[in-house]
Curated annotation (Swiss-Prot):
Residues annotated as the enzyme's active site: D600
Cofactor note: Binds 2 Zn(2+) ions per subunit.
Quaternary state and interactors: Interacts with cdf-1 in a zinc-dependent manner which promotes its activity.
Gene3D superfamilies xref list: 3.30.60.20, Phosphatidylinositol 3-kinase Catalytic Subunit, Chain A, domain 1, Phosphorylase Kinase, domain 1, Transferase(Phosphotransferase) domain 1
Biased composition regions of type Polar residues, renumbered to the chain: 7-19
Family designation: Belongs to the protein kinase superfamily. TKL Ser/Thr protein kinase family. RAF subfamily.
PROSITE patterns for this protein: PROTEIN_KINASE_ATP, PROTEIN_KINASE_DOM, PROTEIN_KINASE_ST, RBD, ZF_DAG_PE_1, ZF_DAG_PE_2
Name the UniProt record assigns to this protein: Raf homolog serine/threonine-protein kinase
Protein residues bound to Zn(2+) 1: H170, C197, C200, C216
Amino acid sequence: MSRINLKKSSAATTPTSPHCPSPRLISLPRCASSSIDRKDQGSPMASPSTPLYPKHSDSLHSLSGHDHSGVGTSDKEPPKFKYKMIMVHLPFDQHSRVEVRPGETARDAISKLLKKRNITPQLCQVNTSPDSKTEAIDLSKTMEEIALHLPDNELWVHSEYLNTVSSIKHAIVRRTFIPPKSCDVCNNPIWMMGFRCEFCQFKFHQRCSSFAPLYCDLLQSVPKNEDLVKQLVGIASENDGPDRSVAEIVLAGLAPTYGQSPAATPDSSHPDLTSIKRTGGVKRHPLAVSPQAETAQLSPAGPYPRDRSSSAPNINAINDEATVQHNQRILDALEAKRLEEESKDKTGSLLSTQARRPHCYSGHILSGSRMNRLHPLVDCTPLGSNSPSSTCSSPPGGLMGPTLLGQSSSVSGSTTSSLVAAHLHTLPLTPPQSAPPQKISPGFFRNRSRSPGERIEAQRPRPPQKPQHEDWEILPNEFVIHYKVGSGSFGTVYRGEFFGTVAIKKLNVVDPTPSQMAAFKNEVAVLKKTRHLNVLLFMGWVREPEIAIITQWCEGSSLYRHIHVQEPRVEFEMSAVIDILKQVSLGMNYLHSKNIIHRDLKTNNIFLMDDMSTVKIGDFGLATVKTKWTVNGGQQQQQPTGSILWMAPEVIRMQDDNPYTPQSDVYSFGVCMYEILSSHLPYSNINNRDQILFMVGRGYLKPDRSKIRTDTPKSLMKLYDNCIMFDRNERPVFGEVLERLRDIILPKLTRSQSAPNVLHYDSQYSVMDAVMRSQMVSSSYIPPSTAKTPQSAAAAAAANKKAYYNVYGLI
């Protein structure tokens, strides 16, 4: 019964303020509550501290069953909210919940969420829908008011600027890194499997995924998007905080593309943008911006960067070419005066620190050797401000810097100071910004005299500089020569010691000209990059006392010694022959891929290691050393060099300017094939050297094919014939030679060299029976000489006959 009376009384009472309702009003009808809200909204005097209807409040408190005699208005109930917790959707697909607290504004509540995520609240707006184009809510209202009128318990925080600056999402794909790459998080190599962003190329391990940045680097996408550049310009000019610095960094990196002159190009590309922090994951570092990049135009349309937002526009930034030229003349006069004073200061007491001090701008220190290419006479000294929001009034483009002011204050009374004072009014200055003025001490820019210790250090003679050595050059005191191994057409080979056993080849070069030395260094630069299993390792070169090269020592002997010198001569099996030819083709194909022509390929330069399974090619390259020139009629003519038995016909004729081609090495390889297959040198029946040169050069003479071993496969013989073709265009390259060698198939079983064993047996017996019975010959055979009696002789004859038939499978 009391419950019914409570409903009637509550329905009959006057509506109360939504700011101080009783918790028991939950059972009120919806129409009553909505009418309360509408009436309360229309009241201009609504206040969260004083109820609109105190009588109704007292009646509600009396209905609640509490005794409020004399204190009914002082004891207030907490307000009624439609939602106690509101879901807030933050930028970059983040979300959080905010509690509706009395008296807390929406700005304060949502700013806490944004600041925890390093998001600038001033760049954001709050809407009641996911669409950022809808009307934003008033952040000065309390969360109570917003919660009352919120259709759903959700709010959306939108920021066009933040999406522009850092909302480019990664396109992460799984990648196999061969060869391994360094992880951009921990800098350790990524072995095989890892992850990479297809947009910004950010690489990381799976274990480092939690430390990877959530968004891409803008430098990968901004150059392709003009609208994005304009938005970045707006951020850099109208906002403050970390987003402004990010926008300036990106625009500084893009300055050569957007509005910056070529002379103001930054020194180098930006470094790695990420570094690992054990407590906070990856932090993006700002780029090291050069003074030219930082003073470059932020907008492609205007010549000067826009100042930070202020109440008054910058009306003094005048794009006047005459003003720039006038300022340049002032700076030229200042530099001339400074050089004149330095020339008079011979004792060093008043040496200007302008040449010693590193050039810096806005706190970024550059090397002292680098000058401002736009205005090389300005030495930009930092103002020493600790406030990140403070700015200095300076002429556009950095024409008038603090060092110029410092020079005028430090050299008072001189021509320089008067010149500066006379022209200061002609320089355009930007209006003061909202930041407080900075106090600059004139003594900060004063030139310092040398101390006595510095004067003594300057007069002390410096030790002579050591001679500069080229890359991969080995000094004479770093290696030791043991004994001579052999000599060839281009030099003499010695065995020596250079951090291990090496081969030292002294080249037949006497007094090389500067051009020949330069060509030799270029070839050495190519040789030092060769790395292959079938190529001797190049270790360096020697300049003094004689030009020499140092290579890997081969613990074995050459193929020439194995075939023609050692006794007994080694006759390789056909499988070993093909394996040797394959390895030579592999090494030569690698050298030709590096544009290295051997010019002297022969069995003397093909080495077999001690294991007899690895082939090494040596004495390759060095065209400068292997070229001889003669003077004929005042003109230099190239002469053929090398060993004539392995020389290609076009090299012998020397009709072309450069007869050495990959096909000339293929011809030499064909002669090496002949040596291995025949165990003879070509043209061994001709003793006249000139006759060999003439006949081979004309195509009249080829190696004798009749001396090649008979078990040579036909496909290998055809390859040999193609390699020694007279026309070099008909010869294959080493890539094709290698494929044809791999296609050669040898029989697995070889023919027996012994006489065949023919078994005669009757057809009624199987072969297995004949074999089994033949094993019993030794036990059943009795020689005839053992017979003593006629009976034993007859028995022996019968046994011999049985053994005979047993041997031939007749029993």
